Amino acid sequence: MNQCRLIYSSIASEKFMSQEELHALVQQCAQNNTRAKIAGLLVLSGDRFLQVLEGPAKAVNRVFNKIILDKRHHDVSLISFESIGPAYFDNWSMRLVDLYDLPMESRQIFMRKYIHEDGVIRLPERLHEVYSLLLDSKALCLSVP
């Protein structure tokens, strides 16, 4: 079965959910992703999302089609879709990293490394910078249970 990695960005809708609703959504996605053998990491910075999904290509495409139609965000932009060998983000079925809600030390590291405005880290556009942010977020998750 072809394994793939899909990365996209989007902007939260004005009537975005509360933190509790967001965490409940991540829990539900984790359950769904486990059944579909999909791994994922969702990064939130201000009102911007960056998400990576890895798994069977058909399953990842099905999930992405649902994501595109989800009214909780807009301006969904596909950054990368590629076949993969080993997965980079297979530690979780879904994990959320809110860059605004990081511990101070971690937040300062991210602020030194990435462009930010008014305390909000701007999500990068270049693919190598996107991978850098995703892998830094993964490392942060691995260091914090």
Identify the meaning behind each predicted range.
Residues 1-145:
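Charge-rich, low-complexity N-terminal segments
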